[in-house]
Amino acid sequence: MDTLNVELGTRSYPILIDAGLIGRPDVFRQHLGAHDVLIVSDTTVAPLYLPALTASLAPRRIVEVILPDGEAHKTLANAARVLDVLIANRFGRDCALIALGGGVVGDLTGFAAACYQRGVALAQVPTTLLAQVDSAVGGKTAVNHPGGKNLIGAFHQPVLVVTDTRTLATLPARELRAGLAEVIKYGLICDAALFGWLEAHLDELLAGAPAALAHVIRRSCEIKAAIVGRDEREVGERALLNLGHTFGHALESATGYKEWLHGEAVGAGLSMAAAMSRECGLLAGDEAARVRRLLERAGLPTRIAAVTPAAVLEHMSVDKKVLGGRLRLVLLRAIGDAFLTADYPAPALARTLAAHCG
């Protein structure tokens, strides 16, 4: 079993990575004690992994909430549903919430854990590649709003992340490709060697090779854990993890969270960020082409025809990185060298949107 740590002083926590962890009672006993547990999952994941998880957690009192699957259900109403169950079952402040699922379940459950009695323990058990490499780590929790993605949320770190790599064996190919977008992002922001490794080993990843997947999960978590440890609240370096996400979140919200998986929208957003970096004279043309080729090989969209540039720009205007009325973007100087800036020419953004939308 691989163990990484997110170093946050007294709130530090482990990321455990191995096959079969959901079925190991010792993993949960060590970190959750004997407290009451509320498990939140969805209609896709629960039939596959909920029985094994509940068996590992016995003999605690366990209550379950099963949500519909999909980004469209990451809502304040469903978070309220989780809170209603906690209150109805008289859960105390010593309870724990466990998120069993992908990014939607993890974000929503984390938000409920942050809200309930001003914060209770949270364990993340991510079952998708995207959640395992990104959303389960770092303490960002949120629900969506019709006006924008993740506009309602809180920072609330888990006490434990249990990454059972065996869950990837049941992951649909589309979900696997979506998760690779976040892995590609890590290479782009700070690890050119990882990006080169992805170019060389992408076929293994797409085929679901366990060793290749374990490698990218560990490396992605190493990068994110280090960044979160240095900048938990995203006042500086952590903003780099949003490469492609300002574009991607706008694409998701502009299409009502129904058209694209989050990772697919991020893939298109990474293509747009690379293209805009080239438009601004920052990123060499051959490197921008490498980014686009890798995204295309991964089966990720590099443009979105179903939404207009004006609609995307409107949704970008409510992004959380807007400061003083100015939209900040994460751009690239090179593969492995990202930076946050509000100093870019508006025509470059307009050309980028026109080339990738509509």
Predicted segments with their positions:
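Alpha-helix C-terminal capping segments
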Residues: 108-119, 254-255, 275
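ATP/NTP phosphate-donor binding region
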Residues: 1-96
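Short glycine/serine/threonine-rich phosphate/pyrophosphate-binding segments
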Residues: 104-111, 132-133, 249-250
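A glycine/threonine-rich phosphate-anchoring loop and its flanking beta-alpha core
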Residues: 16, 111-204
